[in-house]
């Protein structure tokens, strides 16, 4: 990221002027759509990445936009001239400006974050970026906890709240005015024609969302750090902000509590916070009364401090021993696993019954079948049907599509405690593939399988299945045990497409 700081060329007078590179540095536009920057940030899937831009953006079009921007006395290019000269839709200009503004603002923030991490000697581990790396942590920690708060992060309805949140991070007033202008133009365009696509880039909206969440987490972790005796360097990666302590004092006045009383609620060394997919969970070993206090705390934090209407129904208190926790496409719950140990002292032997608490992570089979039914792989009851829209493709293309989907699901749900539901999903996809091919060749499923043989179904074996089938025979007891082993992979950076499918 330090390499791209030179493109901005900030000096002492323009250190916070984000509009300067936007209007006077031409090559920052080309930098935003440079494929090399994407390759350098493979571990950040949303950073400078959008498949549609590769087809309609080029250096020549970018240069023409810059020249027209310099020639115009007003910021808005007339729709008629824009379509006539560029041949693009009238929201093209706003998409260009929004993504460039996000790129310019993100670079200084990323540099500050990187310097903060380097100053604390925090080790960088790419394995921790995997979604599956969270589950071993939860298996080790949640077994000692009683309750979990499952909270849906609220998002402000009025865009002015986002501007106010960003105001404490950006000192440049002109950049904030331009930022507010883009947001209100976005609202006007959206209200004018709801069928039009968003004129703002998803990266720009994602930057706003991350700033909003980071502001909330900085307050929460600040109070958590001040109240805890266990010092941690992970809390030091958040950015310092202007008037932070003044805002904290105002925050306490709203709650009508003194500092010690609020910290008394937060003093809990057995407290773990995990944020994921627009939600966060707070696991702790508390009583129901304290969990209700936590619920009251979060509701008032969002309503009084961030001016966001936050209903208490969005905060669910789950008891791990009774309720299931929906987490990253898994249903997690605590299960009592009885363990009998035979002990012998001298001539007397006796049995000791021990109960071990184990965290089970299962596949939500009903929601997965609902997603498959929506994509026309099966009906609502889970009975496979043919994929009619794929019959125009070649046999190899159809087979490769089904194999890729099946392997991705097996890869993502390899950590399931019960593989029965996983085998059911794979069965649906296999039979759907056979029915699709049989429909294409105008044959029955039985006749098609008889002609093709069992080689078709072997294509659905995953890599780990192929290795196990070579080492152990399927009838071997050791092989059966290995097939029940839970495996967490460290290369999963995305949620599966069937998770939270809407």
From Swiss-Prot:
The keyword rRNA-binding does not apply. InterPro entries: Domain_X, Maturase_MatK, Maturase_MatK_N. Its main location: plastid. The keyword RNA-binding applies. It comes from the Eukaryota. One of its GO terms (molecular function) is RNA binding. One of its GO terms (cellular component) is chloroplast. Keywords: Chloroplast, mRNA processing, Plastid, RNA-binding, tRNA processing. GO terms for biological process: mRNA processing; RNA splicing; tRNA processing. It holds the Pfam family MatK_N. It is found in: Plastid, Chloroplast. Belongs to the intron maturase 2 family. MatK subfamily. Usually encoded in the trnK tRNA gene intron. Probably assists in splicing its own and other chloroplast group II introns. PANTHER family: MATURASE K (PTHR34811:SF1). This is Maturase K. The lineage of its organism: Eukaryota, Viridiplantae, Streptophyta, Embryophyta, Tracheophyta. The gene is matK.
